[in-house]
């Protein structure tokens, strides 16, 4: 008789399972005999130990495994018969009341996958982003590269300006008391690079070698040094050297320093444009994909299995702890990480994953081999030996799978853009690149 699966609430289900004690014991005895052929028991030759002795030493473990196996088989038969897709693992509870002596009974509580309905794509409003790359962006990048290669020349009597390197001594106190990290001598930094807090840079601006200044500085509330975060310090700085940054000319020598073997400035600019366009394309794709996925998940109204959300939370906590370990954070395994901090995003990820999976199936958006190869070849252009990178990915199934997942998402985004209400929006270059 097929067990009856009961709906509790939402995606939660319950089913009663039973296995015969006789069937359990039959399998236990069979496994004990198999173990007995090779088991080493003190006082007996291998394979000659009495079955009763094997029962005492191996019986409990074997019986536990047999019951788990038989109950698991009964559970699979029950859900297969009911044509259910189980999300996560069932929770098994032994039953004793009203159960015959020759039967072991359990109640399995579990969740099922929801019926996922892909929303009407024509009703979705999404944004497709664009950023044109012009000569201005190429020249801007050239300026950044020149500044990175600036040579600093000491200027006597020069008042410091943005782009100058200053060398100074500083000492800070909070309520008249020095604090750790608040003092240094011969400390160099370049004004305008944002390495120091804005108030510190502003205080150093306009000073000449030999000049000093006393000023207050309030540390941000989220400052990395927790002992001074949110507090106001008094700093004294004394400038010892001001050096002007002299930028290199954009010439053959400069081009060669950036890897343009021929020293051809125009080819260098073309290479820079290609690199910018590649980076811009990747960032625009990310923004547009975010808009598409946000629209999908917002329109996807269905319950998600708690088991899948919990599993995602556990995975993200484990990844966060591993990242802390890599950064050398002590006691990374015991740092408090409440599950509720991750649960909202995990629920979104699970919902989106179910939606994307259903959309891929309905619209046949699976990644094609030629798409995967093209994406690998595009990705490989970021490296000095593109052919080796292509071979590296094609030779390993797991690495190819990573690219396949990216291509699949690209296919989903393209499909939604073809069918949704699309608003085009231009993003300023500086904003896109995080420079604004």
From Swiss-Prot:
Main location: cytoplasm
GO BP annotations, alphabetical order: 'de novo' cotranslational protein folding; cell division; chaperone-mediated protein folding; protein transport; protein unfolding
Domain PPIase FKBP-type: 163-248
InterPro entries, per database record: PPIase_dom_sf, PPIase_FKBP_dom, Trig_fac, Trigger_fac_C, Trigger_fac_C_sf, Trigger_fac_ribosome-bd_bac, Trigger_fac_ribosome-bd_sf, Trigger_fact/SurA_dom_sf
Reactions this protein catalyses: [protein]-peptidylproline (omega=180) = [protein]-peptidylproline (omega=0)
Root EC class: isomerase
Cellular compartments annotated: Cytoplasm
EC numbers: 5.2.1.8
Annotated protein name in UniProt: Trigger factor
Species of provenance: Bordetella bronchiseptica (strain ATCC BAA-588 / NCTC 13252 / RB50)
């Amino acid at each position: 008789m097929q067990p009856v699966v009961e709906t509790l609430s939402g995606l939660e289900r319950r089913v009663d399972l039973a296995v015969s004690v006789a069937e359990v014991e039959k399998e236990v005895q069979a496994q004990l005999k198999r173990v007995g052929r090779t088991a080493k028991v003190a006082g007996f030759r291998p394979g000659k130990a009495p079955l009763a002795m094997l029962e005492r030493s191996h019986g409990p473990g074997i019986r536990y495994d047999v019951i788990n196996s038989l109950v698991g088989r009964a559970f699979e038969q029950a859900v297969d018969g009911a044509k259910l897709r189980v999300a996560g693992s069932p929770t098994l509870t032994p039953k004793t009341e009203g159960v015959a002596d020759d039967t072991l009974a359990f109640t399995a509580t579990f969740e099922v996958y929801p019926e996922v309905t892909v929303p009407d794509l024509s009703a979705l409003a999404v944004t497709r982003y664009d950023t044109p790359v012009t000569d201005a962006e190429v020249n801007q990048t050239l300026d950044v590269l020149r500044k990175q290669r600036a040579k600093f020349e000491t200027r006597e009597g020069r008042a410091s300006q943005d782009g100058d390197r200053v060398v100074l001594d500083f000492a800070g106190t909070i309520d008249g008391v020095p604090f750790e990290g608040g003092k240094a001598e011969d400390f160099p930094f370049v004004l305008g690079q944002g390495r120091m807090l804005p108030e510190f840079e502003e205080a150093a601006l306009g000073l000449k070698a030999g000049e000093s200044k006393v000023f207050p500085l309030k540390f941000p509330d989220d400052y990395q040094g927790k002992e001074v975060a949110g507090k106001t310090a008094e700093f004294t700085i004394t400038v010892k050297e001001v050096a002007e940054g002299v930028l290199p000319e954009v010439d053959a020598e400069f081009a060669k320093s950036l890897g343009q073997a021929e020293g051809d400035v125009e080819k260098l600019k073309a290479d820079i444009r290609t690199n910018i366009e590649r980076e811009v394309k990747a960032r625009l794709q990310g923004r547009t994909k975010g808009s598409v996925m946000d629209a999908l998940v917002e329109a996807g109204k269905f319950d998600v299995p708690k088991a899948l959300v919990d599993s995602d939370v556990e995975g993200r906590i484990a990844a966060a702890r591993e990242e802390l370990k890599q950064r050398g954070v002590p006691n990374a395994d015991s740092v408090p990480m409440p599950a509720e901090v991750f649960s909202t995003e995990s629920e979104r990820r699970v919902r989106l994953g179910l939606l994307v999976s259903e959309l891929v199936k309905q619209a046949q958006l699976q990644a094609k081999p030629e798409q995967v190869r093209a994406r690998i070849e595009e990705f490989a252009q970021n490296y000095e030996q593109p052919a080796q990178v292509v071979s590296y990915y094609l030779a390993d199934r797991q690495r190819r799978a990573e690219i396949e997942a990216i291509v699949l998402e690209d296919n989903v985004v393209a499909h939604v853009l073809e069918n949704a209400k699309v608003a085009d929006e231009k993003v300023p270059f500086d904003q896109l690149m995080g420079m604004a």
